Amino acid sequence: MFKKIVKFCLCALVFLMPLFFLPSSVEAFEFNKGYLLFFLVSVGLLAWLGNMVFKNKKVVFRRTPLDLFVLAYLGTMTLATVFSQDKITSLFGYYGRFWPSLIGILSLGGFYFLVTNNVEIKSETEEKSDNKVGQSSLIKAFIWSISFVVLTTYFSLFGFWTKISNYLVSINESLALPDVMVYQGFNPISGSTEILGIFLSIAAVFLLAYLAFKGLVSMRNGAQGVVEKKKQKRQTIFNYILIFSILGLLLIINFWPAWLIMCLSLLAFLIFSFRKRLFKKDVNYLSLPILFLLISIIFLFFSPLQGLFPANSVVNNLPSEILPSQKVSWNIAFQGVKESPLVGSGLGNFSYLFNKFKPESFLNSTVWQIRFDKPINYFTELIGTTGILGVLSYLLLIGMFLLVSFMIVNGKDASSHNSLFTLSILLAFIALIIAQFFYHQDTTLAFVFWFFLALGVVSWKKVVKETTFSFKDFPEIGLICTVIFWAILFGFLFFYFTMGKLYIADVYYRDYLANPTEMKLASEQANSLQKAGQLANSRTVYHIILARAYLGELIKETQQPGPDNQRLANIVALTVAEGKKAVELSPNRVTTQETLGFIYRDIQGLAEGATEWGITVLERAIELEPRNPILISELAKFYVGDSGDMEKAKELFKRALEVKSDYVDAAVSLSILEENEGNTEEAVRLMEDLVSKVPSSVDARFQFGRLYYNQEQYEKAIEQFEIAMQLFPNHSNSIYSLGLVYQKKGDNTKALEMFKKVLELNPGNIEIKNRIDEVSRVSTPETEPETEPEE
């Protein structure tokens, strides 16, 4: 029973990890894969331990040269969590991304020991062991998983899921497929087409090497029975179809790192094969790897398919990830090491580093407002978030694995079944390492890394030792192991309960996003978002969203004709409490400080001391993100408000412009301050400089026109307002201001036309109606009595 559970958990993990997703949570892929990984690994570990303690009555543990390196790596990841800038993120993963996390990495460590102690490598002629899981079971599960990934992706690319969903809806609306599946770029690996390309390139390398070596071994084994030959022929046909299906997807995705990974890995495979003369008796087994190598080289340097497909085709409309460049990612990583050399910013905390150290050049890009939570490649994240200890432990782990594997495949029995299997695993592992230099890692890629690592270690038969402690010889060990088993069991049960609450909370949060409802002040009437916050009190993100939702309710209440003061006070208290809770949980996350700062900004007239608290909080936010002109400008506005320190405000607005010279809000606000102080020339200069840098900004054009209007330079004001209207034809402020200019110039007809247009956009506006009445009276003179012509 225990052995069957272990085998099921291992095979289910290998098969399901690339495929598993659920639409019930906010993020369908990484979040659910993490739960699957933790649950199946924990069940497998319990079954393995239970089999030793309660059935075999002995502890059997395989010792390998890599075990200490794995434990050292897990230890450094734990240290990186303990000393993290944001421990919640390090433990559970950055919300929305979820990988890496300490729980996920420890689960992968458990998976490694589960594989190395319960899987054995067997040739086709060897009998299956009753005690261990055969490697063929896991390889078959992995190949079938790849097959379903490929099939699912083709269905998505060519709209089959949409057609299936529409057909099901025609039968019953409740049968509709989840929204995530009808998205054209859907694939079960993740929401990223690029990650899919990386995964497929690694899968292709493994399959090409594995099938070549499998064919070589079959040839050596000689004649087979008729049934076995037919079975092998069917498998060969299936594998060829799968490999060329993968190639088709790679051609559609056409992601250059995927081609590079395949190119370098297959090149290493061919060089080693020729050097060792592995295929000297039948070089035809190398035909397919050579073909794929040539294709990868061609598509790495050229794009032969470019222009062959229409602009609206699937090939030309695949979604792509927006990520920091290689240069930016490496720069931020080294800045993180400088700040915290040993353990970095903490596991999963790349967002902290990016916010704090993003370069000035990034602010000139079109995506300058994005706070990236991951770099473009995994090694930069490892360097910045886990420091020297993390990188060193990881490199030693990889180095030791490569060293022992190379020793085995270079040994005297390099052409044996065991060595050939090791070589196919080694090539896939090398492909994974190459991938980590060029793209970031998700849960699936991390799992595949540890899967090949564990299988490679299992193939080191000669250097793997077994240690056995029989309970008959050591009764004390039996008692200790029994206690350990129950302690681990209850520990896992506690984690199941805790993580179950977190999962239900996320389901509530997704329900709120799909159907937003009013925030309730009484806990017994809590909506979905409030229930999420109550269930997952340790999740910072829910408190941030709750604070913003309460703030929205507060603004809505203040806009009521007769606001309820008691209700206002209650909402203010709840808003501040949620903002403070978020800061308490993650004081080094800029979004928590920013949210609380904006709360204090919006309640200045409702709560005593809000200005002082707002200044303090935003100053802390700016420490965490010094190159954010928005935060600096919002801090400046606190000084424009109650404190009235105009010089400080001007200093901060200028600082915001130093950070980003074309930031509209700072330039406009500074221009208004200069205008109010009578420095009209400086105000005009600021606006001229702004519109030259951001000519398409409606706000800049409107404010420039307003400035000219106040100076009675009506022609220049008209020019700016008209440009603003060209950019945004329904911009009410520009249309209204243009009407005022025409009214000042005495052109009441045009003025009336502008005001009526504003009324169409803002029906029922009393001020506009009064303005129209005023202009109408002036433009319609009283009728004079007729006079008879003189004779």
Report the location of each language-model feature.
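Alpha-helical transmembrane segments of multi-pass inner-membrane proteins
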Residues: 2-23, 39-49, 69-81, 101-126, ...
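Interfacial juxtamembrane loops and adjacent helix segments
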Residues: 161-187, 311-324, 330-339, 347-384, ...
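Flexible juxtamembrane loops connecting transmembrane helices in multi-pass membrane enzymes
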Residues: 186, 262-266, 272, 285, ...
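Hydrophobic alpha-helical transmembrane segments in integral membrane proteins
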Residues: 302-317, 480-520, 541-545
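Helix-start (N-cap) detector for alpha-helical repeat units in TPR-like alpha-solenoids
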Residues: 505, 540-541, 590-591, 629-630, ...
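Register position in tetratricopeptide repeats
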Residues: 552, 602, 641-642, 676-677, ...
